[in-house]
Amino acid sequence: MSEQKQSLSYKDAGVDIDAGNALVENIKGAVKRTTRPEVMGGLGGFGSVCQLPTGYKEPVLVAGTDGVGTKLRLAIDLAKHDTVGIDLVAMCVNDLIVQGAEPLFFLDYYATAKLDVAVASSVVEGIAEGCIQSGCALVGGETAEMPGMYHKGDYDIAGFCVGVAEKSRLIDGTNVAAGDQLIALGASGPHSNGFSLIRKVLEVNNTDTNELLEGKKIADHLLEPTKIYVKSVLELLKNVDVHALSHITGGGFWENIPRVLPETAQAVIKGDSWQWPSIFNWLQENGNITEHEMYRTFNCGVGMVIVVPADKVAQSIEVLTAHGENAWHLGEIADKADGEEQVVFA
């Protein structure tokens, strides 16, 4: 007589549907706080439905997706899960606003080997907070429990955002011309880029991240949430004819500023117009990193660069400062000669 086989369940295979349901219940309140009047329906459907906002003559949709890179590795190692969701939203919505788009709705993807409801809830609370800061609705997401795909305790997140803009007011850099001026928006820290190098610096120095730097733990400097610029920049766009915006992410100054400039334009940066926040000086010193590599990897304290007409500098800084930004005159646009770089320091 053959031995009776054990009856297996999905939970035996490592997927706990009840835990997933518990997560949905936990996050309902956070999701509800992000709602916009255009959103139709709530969580639980196969898809999310959203109307276009009123007031647009010829609306176009702008979409973006991103993650937070290996900043997540550091956050997991330090058991700091409540702010990476803000980072996730910031990386997406800041990419939309540089094209002149108002973020409309956001979806997230959370993948892990075994779902920890408390950890996942904390992450989603952060996502909801990022959505509130940027004025977009968290309309859905996917939680994937995938045994065998991740190490115990690890997870990964990705975000997807859709925004709306007036077609005639899309910002693509084509209006940038010599004589335009550059305005910087201060960063809150390294944001969500360069963390593989940051983690290498921590490793080779055997750094205790509880060590204080100017009265603040190094861990807190590094994990400070990415600044969300949406509401202040939207206000600027109502008042000033902005010619271009650049979100300073992976690739730093050298890679991101040229993305929004005509090939004939050159950004001339006033290197003495600001001081690097202390965490960047600490990273450069402890990693023996060249200045060129710093500007290629990190934002060095500048989270966004805005190109405006020369006669709009004072007004732009006034509007941005009134809406909570640390804004200053960073430089200007010049004609680029053959063979010259598109970003130079004066």
UniProtKB/Swiss-Prot annotation:
Localization in the cell: Cytoplasm
Annotated Gene Ontology cellular component terms: cytosol
Pfam families given in the database record: AIRS, AIRS_C
Catalytic activity from the UniProt record: 2-formamido-N(1)-(5-O-phospho-beta-D-ribosyl)acetamidine + ATP = 5-amino-1-(5-phospho-beta-D-ribosyl)imidazole + ADP + phosphate + H(+)
The entry's keywords: ATP-binding, Cytoplasm, Ligase, Nucleotide-binding, Purine biosynthesis
Major location category of this protein: cytoplasm
Domain of life, source organism: Bacteria
Keyword Ligase applies: yes
One MF term in the entry's GO annotations: phosphoribosylamine-glycine ligase activity
Gene3D superfamilies registered for this protein in UniProt: PurM-like C-terminal domain (3.90.650.10), PurM-like, N-terminal domain (3.30.1330.10)
Keyword Ligase: yes
Signal sequence annotation: none
EC number: 6.3.3.1
GO biological process: 'de novo' IMP biosynthetic process; adenine biosynthetic process
UniProt pathway annotation: Purine metabolism; IMP biosynthesis via de novo pathway; 5-amino-1-(5-phospho-D-ribosyl)imidazole from N(2)-formyl-N(1)-(5-phospho-D-ribosyl)glycinamide: step 2/2
Family: Belongs to the AIR synthase family.
UniProt xrefs under PANTHER family: TRIFUNCTIONAL PURINE BIOSYNTHETIC PROTEIN ADENOSINE-3, TRIFUNCTIONAL PURINE BIOSYNTHETIC PROTEIN ADENOSINE-3-RELATED
NCBIfam families: purM
Protein name: Phosphoribosylformylglycinamidine cyclo-ligase
Lineage: Bacteria, Pseudomonadati, Pseudomonadota, Gammaproteobacteria, Alteromonadales
Gene: purM
